[in-house]
Amino acid sequence: MTDGHLFNNITLGXRGGTNPGQIKIYSGGILWKRQGGGKTIDVDKTDIMGVTWMKVPKTNQLGVQIKDGLLYKFTGFRDQDVVSLTNFFQNTFGITVEEKQLSVTGRNWGEVDLNGNMLAFMVGSKQAFEVSLADVSQTNLQGKNDVILEFHVDDTTGANEKDSLMEMSFHIPSSNTQFVGDENRPSAQVFRDKIMSMADVGVGGEDAVVTFDGIAILTPRGRYSVELHLSFLRLQGQANDFKIQYSSVVRLFLLPKSNQPHTFVIISLDPPIRKGQTLYPHIVMQFETDTVVDSELAISEDLYNSKYKDKLELSYKGLIHEVFTTVLRGLSGGKVTKPGNFRSCQDGYAVKSSLKAEDGILYPLEKSFFFLPKPPTLILHEEIDYVEFERHAAGGSNMHYFDLLIRLKSEQEHLFRNIQRNEYHNLYGFISSKGLKIMNIADAQQAVGGVAKVLENDDDDAVDPHLERIRNEAGGDESDEEDSDFVIDKDDGGSPTDDSGADVSDASQSGGETEKPAKKEPKKDLSSKASSSKKKSKDADVDGVKKKQKKKKDPNAPKRALSGFMFFSQMERENLKKTNPGISFTDVGRVLGEKWKNLSAEEKEPYEAKAQADKKRYKDEISGYKNPQPMNVDSGNESDSA
């Protein structure tokens, strides 16, 4: 890069653990983005007060201190990067980089260096450890010589972090020369007073600034009393209690539901809160849109004038979701995202769709897509590799819907299914306006109708782009030999493709003669004197036979009952892809087959129960099924509220 340097796999150290990401150091400052989206650190060059290098195990750590006292630590630089970046900081920012050394002697006595809001424990001239005073929640004097620092403990944590720092004790003898005391004010008291003057100790207190009772939260599900304190928010429910520091709040979303008296308010967190083994990066709240509240903020006049005068008012009266968002924004400093220019066919802000096995609504926003309510899925435009519009392979009522596949640069895919067909013009126009790559309509863009050429094709024999793409990807990996490790039930019909098991009709599953390549009959010798017209006639006859065979499929036939393995595959496939990025199509089937084979009868029971219920459903539907006469399929002008 001529303007700076770009590095991948650089971790940011923080109270919630380490987060990998990408850092850009350029003439305007420093920009770090977390891998997979979430937290972003943007430091302007005018805010940089100092830069340090430290050699840590296996790599190098870059420390950047800014004007407000914060210190960011970026780890993962090579030795050759140290030289190039040191010269860059000197030549571009005019900053001389300081080199720090890490103490590895194991001594627990030394001196304390207080700089900004950082406390560094020094052993000789080397640093043993460093903590941020912004994370200190309380200080206590124990006896005459001991000071205990208590750190903020909340329910946010890194995905791989099991432990967090709760408290630390310092022993300051009366003979200490750095913090000199007297008989009435010992050295430990001098040290504690110094910490309290630098740390934001006690901010937030025990009293809430404002409380919202009986708020419905969809993720994590429950009804909670939401308390907004000065430095954190608390969710108090009957079974759960979450405390969340405002430093973990990345962004707020205010998204109305179309034709329904509810509004979503989403709090995006980094790091997320944890409940058991489940991480919740998004708190999804649902407010009644027409509810009006009158709230007074419990903030002292002095504190309000000194810190919050430009951010908050002392009293609010208005719609509950607007009051909640305004107060939370003022306290946390988080930005609020609202719906942008997209409008559905009913002039709403979202479209109905399904993700995995869950029905919900998809919000196309100015810089992202957001699927709600469960599982809440945020997809940033900058992380998208391409999108595909996919028509359903079956006919009948399914022709009123299409799917939207979003593939990320990380090769992860999100398939939003069963979107009403009369929404595709709005979606196509919106996606095109954002400059996102659309894979399967590059040729159709130049023709009249554009995406309509793909989605409005009523030919039941048309190719499903998603299914065809999966087959093409799998074709290069499949071998001629049968995989003996892949053992399934006789009626499974093989490993299903992504999300295909729930949507294919009975005709498409049972039509083995049309799915398998037909055996080629030996060609008969043709007379050299045969006219070309006879050859064309013969070819036409062959094509006619093939088309007649294809028409044996009935798109209106009931969906065939799925086996227990098919239900198991649908549940496990996405998890398998997440834990094994880049796994091939055939390996997915093999691993799922092995997992199914190793399950006990008790573990298979819930899947077999679903299979029995589906079998009964199929039996009931097929018993009353009659092959209908051909009929015209309506283009689909009806629409449900998004």
From Swiss-Prot:
It holds the Pfam family SSrecog. It is found in: Nucleus; Chromosome. Residues 629-642 have a biased composition (Polar residues). Residues 558-626 bind DNA. Component of the FACT complex, a stable heterodimer of SPT16 and SSRP1. This is FACT complex subunit SSRP1. Component of the FACT complex, a general chromatin factor that acts to reorganize nucleosomes. The FACT complex is involved in multiple processes that require DNA as a template such as mRNA elongation, DNA replication and DNA repair. During transcription elongation the FACT complex acts as a histone chaperone that both destabilizes and restores nucleosomal structure. Its main location: nucleus. SMART domains: HMG (SM00398), Rtt106 (SM01287). Belongs to the SSRP1 family. The keyword Transferase does not apply. Residues 470-566, 598-642 are annotated as: Disordered. It comes from the Eukaryota. Keywords: Chromosome, DNA damage, DNA repair, DNA replication, DNA-binding, Nucleus, Transcription, Transcription regulation. One of its GO terms (cellular component) is FACT complex. Residues 475-486 have a biased composition (Acidic residues). Residues 513-527, 598-623 have a biased composition (Basic and acidic residues). It comes from Vicia faba. One of its GO terms (molecular function) is histone binding.
